[in-house]
């Protein structure tokens, strides 16, 4: 029997998707634009990083070749990868976190999420009125589209004075609630989010997100690691449910449990920051038994650097991840499969602060598996189906496994 390890570099797109124009994202390229900025010296930051983007281990697996495939080009002739590589398009109608992860796990999202308009106020009066009444709140602040760090800096002090939570949204299907961990209370914030989750179901909102923070002034406010996502359950069983139904474990690292509304996730291991998440993933690799799936999300790429349009920070985070990749590769044993991918793009050079509609990389390795191109995949769901095949699980309805190509190339 086999084991599988699935690492999602949150938002690490490799070039605009065929339907990117529908999202206003034609030309977006998270990886390409970061690499270009680094090569031009525009991502140098004293004490952080300098020079061209340095990702030798992902490049060895085939990152550049995957980006070429995403762009419709042939990979560089003569390139000999140390693993397999390809690019995948998204079939889901959105470019959000749940859609990307659910599709990776074999279930594209066929319906349109609900969204709140970019107006002030953004939320329907009926929704906010019910939230205030049912959660016993003195009111709410913000009620608009906003960057989380900006809106906390702007309204955090008023929140502490008044006890009103900060409620905001974005171009994603989200209702976010920020509150101070001690002045408002972490458990109280979670309770308010549970109420909001129930109320926004009528609006087809994908996630309610608790955004706790600490500090006493606009200069010192800082979000903590106690974020919690309250997601709609996937519309049908995912790869995770198939693993669980077979009596095996799904170890979710980071926010995986929240993204799947804890359906099919048998164990959750939380950590703060990409490097701590990497430590947790390595620990789970050590603990994984035959037939288990370790599913990790590395959120900092998206939340700290993509949305904040921080090119140097994103580049440094990629380089830090790449430096540690040999630790994961070194833990692979006969029968193991490791896949690196992403759930969408978030080009830090792009206009605005939101996700970008992009193809994502598929990079992977495993003892005895073939090396080279798996080509352009027409759905992220091919990743989940490949893992299902590898773990000898029943096939799903949406993706096409490429495991046979890895075993018989």
UniProtKB/Swiss-Prot annotation:
Compartment(s) of residence:
Cytoplasm
Q: Which reaction does it catalyse?
A: 2-deoxy-alpha-D-ribose 1-phosphate = 2-deoxy-D-ribose 5-phosphate; alpha-D-ribose 1-phosphate = D-ribose 5-phosphate
Keyword list (alphabetical) reads: Cytoplasm, Isomerase, Manganese, Metal-binding
Task: Choose one Gene Ontology CC annotation of this protein and give it.
Answer: cytosol
| Requisite cofactors | Mn(2+)
Asked whether the UniProt record includes Cell wall biogenesis/degradation among its keywords, one would answer no
Q: Provide the binding site for Mn(2+) 2.
A: 302, 307, 355
Which cysteines pair up through disulfides? They are none
What are the GO BP annotations of this UniProt entry?
A: 2-deoxyribose 1-phosphate catabolic process; 5-phosphoribose 1-diphosphate biosynthetic process; metabolic compound salvage; nucleotide metabolic process
Record InterPro entries: Alkaline_phosphatase_core_sf (IPR017850), DeoB (IPR010045), Metalloenzyme (IPR006124), Phosphopentomutase_DeoB_cap_sf (IPR024052)
Q: Name one GO molecular function term.
A: phosphopentomutase activity
What pathway annotation does it carry? Carbohydrate degradation; 2-deoxy-D-ribose 1-phosphate degradation; D-glyceraldehyde 3-phosphate and acetaldehyde from 2-deoxy-alpha-D-ribose 1-phosphate: step 1/2
Binding residues annotated for Mn(2+) 1, in chain numbering:
10, 343-344
CC cofactor note: Binds 2 manganese ions.
Pfam families assigned: Metalloenzyme
Write the Enzyme Commission number(s) for this entry.
5.4.2.7
EC primary class? isomerase
Family listed: Belongs to the phosphopentomutase family.
HAMAP family cross-referenced by the UniProt entry = Phosphopentomut
Query: What's its job?
Result: Isomerase that catalyzes the conversion of deoxy-ribose 1-phosphate (dRib-1-P) and ribose 1-phosphate (Rib-1-P) to deoxy-ribose 5-phosphate (dRib-5-P) and ribose 5-phosphate (Rib-5-P), respectively.
Protein name, per record: Phosphopentomutase
The species this protein was found in: Chelativorans sp. (strain BNC1)
Highest lineage ranks of the organism?
A: Bacteria, Pseudomonadati, Pseudomonadota, Alphaproteobacteria, Hyphomicrobiales
């Amino acid at each position: 029997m086999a084991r599988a390890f699935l690492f999602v570099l949150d938002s690490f797109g490799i070039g605009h998707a065929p339907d990117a124009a529908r999202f206003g994202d034609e030309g977006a390229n998270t990886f390409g634009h970061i690499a270009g900025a680094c090569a031009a010296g525009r991502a140098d930051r004293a004490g952080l990083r300098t020079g061209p983007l340095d990702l030798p281990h992902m490049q060895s697996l085939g990152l550049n070749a995957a980006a070429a495939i995403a762009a419709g080009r042939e990979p560089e002739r003569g390139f000999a990868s140390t693993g397999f590589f390809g690019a995948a398009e998204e079939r889901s109608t959105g470019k959000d976190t749940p859609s990307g992860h659910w599709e990776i796990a074999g279930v594209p999202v066929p319906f349109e999420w609900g969204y709140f308009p970019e107006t002030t106020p953004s939320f329907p009066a009926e929704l906010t009125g019910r939230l205030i009444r049912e959660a016993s709140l003195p009111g709410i602040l913000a009620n608009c589209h906003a960057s989380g760090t900006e809106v906390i800096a702007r309204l955090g002090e008023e929140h502490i004075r008044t006890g009103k939570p900060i409620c905001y949204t974005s171009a994603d299907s989200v209702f976010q609630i920020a509150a101070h961990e001690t002045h408002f209370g972490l458990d109280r914030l979670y309770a308010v989010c549970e109420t909001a989750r129930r109320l926004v179901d009528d609006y087809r909102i994908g996630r309610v997100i608790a955004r706790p923070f600490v500090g006493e002034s606009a200069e010192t406010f800082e979000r903590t690691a106690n974020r919690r996502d309250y997601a709609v359950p996937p519309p049908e069983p995912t790869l995770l449910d198939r693993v669980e139904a077979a009596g095996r474990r799904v170890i979710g690292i980071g926010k995986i449990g929240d993204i799947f509304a804890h359906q099919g996730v048998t164990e959750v291991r939380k950590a703060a920051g990409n490097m701590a998440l990497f430590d947790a993933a390595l620990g789970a690799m050590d603990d994984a038994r035959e037939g288990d799936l370790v599913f990790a999300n590395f959120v900092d790429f998206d939340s700290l650097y993509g949305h904040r349009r921080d090119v140097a920070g994103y580049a440094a985070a990629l380089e830090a991840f790449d430096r540690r990749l040999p630790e994961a590769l070194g833990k692979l044993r006969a029968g193991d499969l490791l896949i690196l991918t992403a759930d969408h793009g978030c080009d830090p050079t792009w206009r605005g602060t939101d996700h970008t509609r992009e193809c994502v990389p598929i990079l992977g390795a495993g003892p005895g598996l073939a090396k080279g191109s798996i080509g352009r995949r027409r759905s992220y769901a091919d990743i989940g189906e490949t893992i299902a095949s590898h773990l000898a699980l029943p096939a799903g309805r949406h993706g096409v496994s490429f495991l046979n190509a890895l075993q018989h190339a």
